[in-house]
């Protein structure tokens, strides 16, 4: 029979889930970080990842709307500001668009979402549905993938700057900001989960929530790998580098 875990035991279980299932283990990331992708494949990654970036503040707004405690809302709303910014030129979304601009992707193509892979769209929508329909505790627990983000960000920035001459430090500014934002956010979410997952059932639910979120991130990379690496089957309406990038048009 499953026993009630102490808060520290629960944290250990959650970290074990991330160690096994976080998307830093996905083959696509190994290719990206070790310079094994061409410019078009990196463009495809950045374009599809924007759909996830765009929906992060929508996710956080959905969670915020369910918080009855004003003190909790004041803490959580910082996440929305981090991504939306205080102006169109500020925040995580703007910084991601700076990356796609630097990679030669037309801004309209990125923002419209019309060239997304279906797997990207479905994974992101599944995440939004999850945080809207599940309990507040589960929604907060699903954000705990941020516990593992600093490691992958460090690998990504170092690897991309080393291997891709079309990437600059300025283009990767999004990740530099996340090195401080993600630990702050994950520390708070982890403390909340450890405090409120006070029954066996709740502990099982928060572990399932993190497992689900890992699958959302993994599914996005699966879609990219199938379309742009192997076997190379691209959805007919999805991004094709030779056709859709500014570089090809020039």
Swiss-Prot record:
EC number: 1.3.3.11
Catalytic activity annotation: 6-(2-amino-2-carboxyethyl)-7,8-dioxo-1,2,3,4,7,8-hexahydroquinoline-2,4-dicarboxylate + 3 O2 = pyrroloquinoline quinone + 2 H2O2 + 2 H2O + H(+)
Keyword set, alphabetical order: Oxidoreductase, PQQ biosynthesis
Pfam families hit by this protein: TENA_THI-4 (PF03070)
Any one GO MF annotation of this record: pyrroloquinoline-quinone synthase activity
Purpose: Ring cyclization and eight-electron oxidation of 3a-(2-amino-2-carboxyethyl)-4,5-dioxo-4,5,6,7,8,9-hexahydroquinoline-7,9-dicarboxylic-acid to PQQ.
Family: Belongs to the PqqC family.
Name the record gives this protein: Pyrroloquinoline-quinone synthase
Organism, as annotated: Xanthomonas campestris pv. campestris (strain B100)
Source taxonomy: Bacteria, Pseudomonadati, Pseudomonadota, Gammaproteobacteria, Lysobacterales
Gene name in the database record: pqqC
């Amino acid at each position: 029979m499953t026993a009630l875990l102490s808060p520290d035991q629960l944290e250990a279980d959650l970290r074990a889930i991330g160690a096994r299932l976080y998307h830093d283990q996905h083959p696509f990331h190994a290719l990206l970080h070790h310079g094994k992708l061409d410019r078009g494949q990196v463009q495809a990654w950045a374009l599809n990842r924007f759909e996830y970036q765009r929906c992060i503040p929508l996710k956080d707004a959905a969670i915020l709307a369910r918080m009855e405690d004003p003190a909790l809302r004041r803490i959580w709303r910082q996440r929305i500001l981090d991504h939306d910014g205080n102006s169109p030129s500020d925040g995580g979304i703007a910084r991601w668009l700076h990356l796609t601009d630097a990679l030669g992707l037309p801004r309209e193509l990125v923002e419209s979402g019309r060239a997304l892979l279906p797997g990207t769209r479905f994974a992101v929508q599944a995440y939004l549905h999850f945080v809207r329909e599940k309990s507040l505790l589960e929604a907060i627990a699903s954000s705990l993938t941020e516990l593992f983000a600093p490691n992958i960000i460090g690998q990504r920035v170092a690897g991309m700057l080393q291997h891709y001459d079309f990437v600059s430090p300025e283009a990767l500014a999004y990740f530099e900001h996340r090195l401080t934002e993600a630990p702050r956010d994950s520390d708070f979410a982890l403390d909340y989960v450890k405090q409120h997952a006070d029954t066996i059932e709740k502990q099982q639910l928060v572990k399932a929530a993190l497992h689900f979120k890992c699958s959302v991130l993994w599914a996005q990379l699966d879609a990219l790998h199938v379309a742009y690496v192997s076997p190379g089957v691209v959805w007919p309406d999805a991004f094709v580098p030779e056709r859709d990038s500014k570089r090809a048009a020039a």
